Amino acid sequence: MAHRPKRTFRQRAADSSDSDGAEESPAEPGAPRELPVPGSAEEEPPSGGGRAQVAGLPHRVRGPRGRGRVWASSRRATKAAPRADEGSESRTLDVSTDEEDKIHHSSESKDDQGLSSDSSSSLGEKELSSTVKIPDAAFIQAARRKRELARAQDDYISLDVQHTSSISGMKRESEDDPESEPDDHEKRIPFTLRPQTLRQRMAEESISRNEETSEESQEDEKQDTWEQQQMRKAVKIIEERDIDLSCGNGSSKVKKFDTSISFPPVNLEIIKKQLNTRLTLLQETHRSHLREYEKYVQDVKSSKSTIQNLESSSNQALNCKFYKSMKIYVENLIDCLNEKIINIQEIESSMHALLLKQAMTFMKRRQDELKHESTYLQQLSRKDETSTSGNFSVDEKTQWILEEIESRRTKRRQARVLSGNCNHQEGTSSDDELPSAEMIDFQKSQGDILQKQKKVFEEVQDDFCNIQNILLKFQQWREKFPDSYYEAFISLCIPKLLNPLIRVQLIDWNPLKLESTGLKEMPWFKSVEEFMDSSVEDSKKESSSDKKVLSAIINKTIIPRLTDFVEFLWDPLSTSQTTSLITHCRVILEEHSTCENEVSKSRQDLLKSIVSRMKKAVEDDVFIPLYPKSAVENKTSPHSKFQERQFWSGLKLFRNILLWNGLLTDDTLQELGLGKLLNRYLIIALLNATPGPDVVKKCNQVAACLPEKWFENSAMRTSIPQLENFIQFLLQSAHKLSRSEFRDEVEEIILILVKIKALNQAESFIGEHHLDHLKSLIKED
């Protein structure tokens, strides 16, 4: 290990005797040495042995610490040198008490060497020979003999329990003196650690105290340094204050007011002039500051505008990137839709053909059954008129059709009995049952078409087939660049882009079924509504806003499909189909109609199709035959049953037509329902019937179908012109029934007249037949 450079120390002249004393060695090996008391070095300069100096050094708190360290470190360094040379020999010597003191003294000085950082190697070399004397061979031999003689005595107990420092030292000792090693039987096996001597314990305690004292001394040194610094600062501040006070006293003496001096009289004009001059200067300064402030404000504004220009110029690259990505996206979307539109049209055609085939099957079957049954009854009537004894033969086809008709009617009666519907009238049922084999084929074909529907966009990413994702793209465009968005008329393009995607979702949609999904519950409808609700356009762009997107989609996609259902698939005689169709049409035509000033061609086409289809149903499907009274008086005769069924079937169509109240105009409904159906077919059948409770019941059903909206005007005394024939029939029936005992039926007829606002006719009838008790019915109305 490298030695520190040599250091020089100043020593007092009085310490020379101490250094001389340090060179002295004990006169005799066995002479006892007195252990120094810890803390004695506090009062004395370093003198005597280095051991006393080392023990007393840490206990000094005040006094000349520097010189104490010099002596202690020099002594330690001096005594450390011979111990390093002698090595293990000095550590393994087993001598008498005096030699043990010397060896112990040497070990303590070696331990104290680590406590001082100021030792000098040069000084230790000078004092090496004077402080420690190495015992010679004669001295060692004499000590060994003395120890052996002491061991030979029986009552001798050795107090030397000091352990050898190391195994290597013992080996070297045995090698140096093999004769001194005891025999095997004289060796003692150490089972525990040998106890320390009193001197060793005292030395260890002194070392620990020295370490603690050294730490305390370092803290005391820091505390002393800090106190001195604070005192120097305080003295310096006090001196400065004294200097200031002295200067202040001197200046006060100089500036002392002398009352003997006289001043010229005060002139107010001069003071005023000075104040005005000062005010002018301040105003000019203020104006200059204002000019500078305005200049700074202009600079700030120009800086802000420059920043905005720079930011906008830096965003041009991002804007270009966005427009480019949007252009690529729209092109890819159009290419995808153009590729899929052919497949979509094929699937739509397949589904439409399947439903059309089913509808035509029902219609053709109804017409064929009506034709065969009517022919059979006519033949039966001719037979009854010509002869009563001849045999009547029916061809096999007619017989099979009649049996099939009766079989289906029987099943429907049983179903109504099970459901508890006992008020059903024959002829009002929808004869739309299919044989099981045909139903299985229909369901299989429909399932195959729906599987093809699912595979249309199976391999396409959601960004190009999901309506919500597509609208989100355009919504981002609208939020980032609204000007370019509205300039591109995107609200007019979106319905065309979404048309194929919506048509795919409408393949399984059948508005003629009551269980069909409503438009508001469809995914595309909700997505479009969310897109419209998120619109942030201002009032200036309201005319071209995205709020018309849904109406445009309905006009371009939904209404044309609905028109196809009305023209080719809708059966006006079916109440369930009519009710479901009206529900969807109300949503389309009322809640999402276009602007009042704008005429929708698709909407007009739909309404025309509805009216045209109902006219066709009135002309083709309504057939009420007229038979002789002798044939229909018997309610169980086939003629009477057939006539009843056909009347109720016509009344069912009458009711279905008037369900369009609110969607079709009143003139259209009155012309179609009252003019062509009621007056042309139903009234004739009623006139051919015998007056009685059945006729009154039928009249009640006719009046119940009429919309209340037509009779809301309380000032009406006469009904609408199209009901004139019906009113005359009611009065005629009332005249006939009043002559008999059907007074309750007469009262019901009066109520019907009051309901349809034929009040004048009702009052005339009551006055003519002196039915004063029925006048209250008119007054209550």
From Swiss-Prot:
GO terms for cellular component: cytosol; nucleolus; nucleoplasm; nucleus; U2-type post-mRNA release spliceosomal complex. Residues 114-123 have a biased composition (Low complexity). It is found in: Nucleus, Nucleoplasm; Nucleus, Nucleolus. Keywords: Coiled coil, mRNA processing, mRNA splicing, Nucleus, Phosphoprotein. InterPro entries: GCFC2-like, GCFC_dom. Residues 82-92, 101-113, 201-212 have a biased composition (Basic and acidic residues). Widely expressed in tissues and cell lines. The modification Phosphothreonine is found at residues 97, 213. The modification Phosphoserine is found at residues 16-17, 19, 40, 96, 129, 174, 180, 214, 217. GO terms for biological process: mRNA splicing, via spliceosome; spliceosomal complex assembly. Residues 1-10, 59-68 have a biased composition (Basic residues). Residues 267-312 form a coiled coil. Residues 17-26, 213-222 have a biased composition (Acidic residues). Residues 1-228 are annotated as: Disordered. One of its GO terms (molecular function) is DNA binding. Found in the Intron Large (IL) complex, a post-mRNA release spliceosomal complex containing the excised intron, U2, U5 and U6 snRNPs, and splicing factors. Interacts with TFIP11 and DHX15. Belongs to the GCF family. Involved in pre-mRNA splicing through regulating spliceosome C complex formation. May play a role during late-stage splicing events and turnover of excised introns. This is Intron Large complex component GCFC2.
